[in-house]
Amino acid sequence: MVKLSGVYKGMRKGYGETLIELGKKYENLVVLDADLSGSTQTAMFAKEFPERFFNAGVAEQNMIGMAAGLATTGKIVFASSFSMFASGRAWEIIRNLVAYPKLNVKIVATHAGITVGEDGASHQMCEDIAIMRAIPNMVVIAPTDYYHTKNVIRTIAEYKGPVYVRMPRRDTEIIYENEEEATFEIGKGKILVDGEDLTIIATGEEVPEALRAGEILKENGISAEIVEMATIKPIDEEIIKKSKDFVVTVEDHSIIGGLGGAVAEVIASNGLNKKLLRIGINDVFGRSGKADELLKYYGLDGESIAKRIMEEMKKE
């Protein structure tokens, strides 16, 4: 059972707390950061296990190279920075030194998407899903809330191979009652709300907004199935095949190459007779502003999502 709780808590905090838990469980787990540990929350691990924490400085490419080297010695490696730098600046090193040899490196990137806020376009990474899912051997995940993040981090620690996880800067609304409810399995989507008229597939911090949109649609006599798609690669093709004839994707990411692109590929490759509406960042750069204002500006808040869906349904 999921619901909009009205309680907000940072996924980054869930990440930091879970790193400490995993550090106690796995003596071969190490954590790297690129001089942003206070923001990424890896500082929690550094305080608890200083001998297993390495600050690479503002040198993300070097950090990934260090992570790859440590992984070859049997370490479980977590490497973190802001998503713009962890995925963008370090992309070639990730491709050639981590993904190509399929090393056990987990790149956990924070401050993803438009809701970075006042930092503006230079820090608003809305292309990371696209560039990371294009890399062979790479798993790409966007957790939903604080509790869900904890289970995502636990799961990828046990998975042997490269993983990219993105999470936002802001505190996001909790939709799960506890960790037990916030189940996660790599490559599996999850139906959160049953519906008959359309399917909304959302990922990351947009899942609560999709739930909010679903409530507004219900008030207007429209029954929406809501699907949480935490793993964008490998994507759950079966849940897409079983979706309604009208599919809407929602993401805090470019509609090019992100969740919308991934769902479009499944629909096209399988010859599915489904209408697709992609809601996300429409091939533009971000701008400075408060997170909530930016969500509304780019049409990514629940009210705007519902309005866009109703407008689209009137065309049918």
From Swiss-Prot:
UniProt cofactor note: Binds 1 thiamine pyrophosphate per subunit.
UniProt xrefs under InterPro entries: PDH/Transketolase, THDP-binding, Transketo_C/PFOR_II, Transketolase-like_Pyr-bd, Transketolase_BS, Transketolase_C
The name this protein goes by in its record: Putative transketolase C-terminal section
Entry cofactors: thiamine diphosphate
Enzyme Commission no: 2.2.1.1
Tree of life domain: Archaea
One record GO biological process: sulfur compound biosynthetic process
SMART domains: Transket_pyr
Family annotation (Gene3D superfamilies): 3.40.50.920, 3.40.50.970
Species the sequence originates in: Methanocaldococcus jannaschii (strain ATCC 43067 / DSM 2661 / JAL-1 / JCM 10045 / NBRC 100440) (Methanococcus jannaschii)
Keyword vocabulary terms for this entry: Thiamine pyrophosphate, Transferase
UniProt record similarity statement: Belongs to the transketolase family.
Catalytic activities: D-sedoheptulose 7-phosphate + D-glyceraldehyde 3-phosphate = aldehydo-D-ribose 5-phosphate + D-xylulose 5-phosphate
PANTHER family, per database record: PYRUVATE DEHYDROGENASE E1 COMPONENT, TRANSKETOLASE-LIKE PYRIMIDINE-BINDING DOMAIN-CONTAINING PROTEIN
GO molecular function: transketolase activity
